[in-house]
Amino acid sequence: MDLRPIGIFDSGVGGLTVLKRLVEVLPGEDYIYFGDTKRVPYGDRSEEEIKKFAKQILNFMREQKVKAVVIACNTTCAVINKSEYDVVLFDVLKAGAESAALYTINKKIGVIATTRTVESKSYEKNIKIIDKNIEVYQKACPEFVPLIEKGLYNSPIAYETASKCLKELKEKDIDTLVLGCTHYPLMASVIEEIMGENVKIVDPAIKLAYDVKDYLLKKDLLNPQIRGKAEFFVSGDKDNFIKTAEMLLGEKIENVLHVDIEKY
């Protein structure tokens, strides 16, 4: 038994899609969520900047006395060295690669992600560790995150933008598409409509949530309470964050606190 909370962080609202899955699988846990809304998006930032941001956020999480941290940001997962940190870390990118390799039948997988994640080739590397015969086609969709952060994920402009970005992958005969950024599940209905029913859309957060549960069970670290709570911290704008959080989690969000993350 361990009553400490689980930490989750992302560049903005995207990680809320991961929090939603975690609450579904582990409703008794308490959660500390940090959204770096001041510095979003991460996708076009340098590797050095992202590493610095991750260090600051993990220092903040350590101060919150969390028992584990879920990195709900594929871009961060793609560039940091997890072994440098003395906290248990769960990697959304690794979970996505494992899920995609499991689902594909024709061994043709598409990955949409931020520019930085695509350039790192982290998905391709992780998928090919599992099965070197799988073909991986990656496409950067940098326009998605700004739209989602503004709450425009189901708008006509979202459909138009997604159609342009996905055109190349539609021509590759993929049967599996990884949403390689935790913001992208907010556009899942748009993406599914464009790709068609024959393409399996993979949300890495589903497997990730079960990975966390398996770890807590194995280490006897589960919180025994029936229903936990979530606390939210942001570095910048609260308004769109609260709106998206309430829509995703289906409840009123009042405890969103501002934190000066750069002091960490």
UniProtKB/Swiss-Prot annotation:
InterPro entries: Asp/Glu/hydantoin_racemase (IPR015942), Asp/Glu_race (IPR001920), Asp/Glu_racemase_AS_2 (IPR033134), Glu_race (IPR004391)
Domain of life: Bacteria
GO biological process, one term: cell wall organization
Reactions listed under catalytic activity: L-glutamate = D-glutamate
Pathway info: Cell wall biogenesis; peptidoglycan biosynthesis
Known EC number: 5.1.1.3
GO molecular function ontology, one term from the record: glutamate racemase activity
A family per Pfam: Asp_Glu_race
Coiled-coil intervals, chain numbering: none
The protein's enzyme class: isomerase
PANTHER family attached to this UniProt entry: GLUTAMATE RACEMASE
Function: Provides the (R)-glutamate required for cell wall biosynthesis.
NCBIfam families for the chain: glut_race (TIGR00067)
Protein name: Glutamate racemase
Encoding gene, per UniProt annotation: murI
